[in-house]
Amino acid sequence: MSILKEFREFAVKGNVMDMAVGVIIGGAFGKIVSSLVSDVIMPPIGWLIGGVDFKDLAIQIAPAKEGAEAVMLKYGAFIQNIFDFLIIAIAVFSMVKAINSLKRPPEVAEAPAVAKGPTQEELLAEIRDLLKK
């Protein structure tokens, strides 16, 4: 079997195509969530804290030198990325939970209780009576 034919079979399988669509949609979803966090969620939080723009929060590690900018530790961007992650994680968890609830087999009603048979003593007494005959 040629490599090209094997690759074609691999690429055309349903799982690979589903995964490709998922990656594309995931990339677009990530951009939407990033915009939601940086443009909608963080500005009001910054305003409530006292007019802080989280994008600008940073600690200067080394001052600027000739021809080089100052070295900055931008923890504000890190905080925004944490919010991005939390929103994406909650969304993915919710979708997986919804899909799993749809995949569960419907619960089967319990079978009606079977009538109890004779007890061991009753069976032994019946055998004894049969042997006496």
From Swiss-Prot:
What is a GO molecular function of this protein? Answer: mechanosensitive monoatomic ion channel activity
Q: How does it sit in the membrane?
A: Multi-pass membrane protein
Task: Give an example GO cellular component term for this record.
Answer: plasma membrane
Arranged from A to Z, the UniProt key words for this protein are: Cell inner membrane, Cell membrane, Ion channel, Ion transport, Membrane, Transmembrane, Transmembrane helix, Transport
The subcellular localization recorded is:
Cell inner membrane
Q: Any transmembrane segments, and where?
A: 10-30, 76-96
Superkingdom as given in the UniProt entry: Bacteria
Task: Give the range the annotation lists for the signal sequence.
Answer: none
InterPro entries with a match to the protein in the record:
Mechanosensitive_channel_CS, MS_channel, MSC/AndL, MscL_channel
The protein's job, in short, is: Channel that opens in response to stretch forces in the membrane lipid bilayer. May participate in the regulation of osmotic pressure changes within the cell.
Subunit and interaction comment: Homopentamer.
Q: Which PANTHER family match?
A: LARGE-CONDUCTANCE MECHANOSENSITIVE CHANNEL, MECHANOSENSITIVE CHANNEL MSCL
| Entry similarity comment | Belongs to the MscL family.
NCBIfam families per UniProt: mscL, PRK00567.1-4
Protein name, UniProt field: Large-conductance mechanosensitive channel
Annotated source species: Haemophilus ducreyi (strain 35000HP / ATCC 700724)
